[in-house]
Amino acid sequence: GHEDWLIQFKREGAGIALLDPVALTRAGADWNEFNDAVGDATWILHDSLMDLPGFAEIGLKPKALFDTEIAARLLGLHRFGLAAVTEHYLGITLAKEHSAADWSYRPLPRDWRNYAALDVEVLIELETMMRRDLKAAGKDEWAAEEFSHALVAGLAPRKLHPIPWLHISRITQLSRDPRGLAIAKSLWEE
């Protein structure tokens, strides 16, 4: 399945929380309590379709969404990664040195945690500015439809492959390696 190793969360007027969903789920966390606490608040994500399936798997259920990547595309930005959008709107250059890190590693080093926290630190301000621009461009209703569609698509039950071990992360890299596939299958079945 899709496993999220870190959830970064910030609520306006509050600090940033970095949550380990794997450890919390193993410890019996009741994600319904989290959903109730968040309520109808809009979740601001960048590239929501990367995160929503993993959220759905553990029981996180956003009710409203603003996706800064979708907004950037609708606004015609030529580059729509979070770093590019942040630089465009806020003039801040986000360091991306840990973007390819193995986020399953524990404990997370302090500089990784700082890196992860900075990603969400900018989202509320980005949403405010991007909503203004969407409205000015007459694209706010279109954006709302796109966000709603992304939310439904991202939280929809995933169609699982009938062969469970083929869900192993990055298994497609072994598609032309029969020996590697056999080893992966063997490890899955142990």
What are these regions (language model features)?
Residues 71-73, 125, 190:
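Short, hydrophobic/amphipathic alpha-helical patches that form generic packing surfaces
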Residues 94-159, 185-188:
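Acidic, Mg2+-coordinating catalytic module of metal-dependent nucleases/exonucleases
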Residues 31, 68, 79-83, 139-140, ...:
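Alpha-helix initiation and N-capping motif
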Residues 1-84, 88:
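Conserved RNase H-like, two-metal-ion catalytic cores of nucleic-acid enzymes
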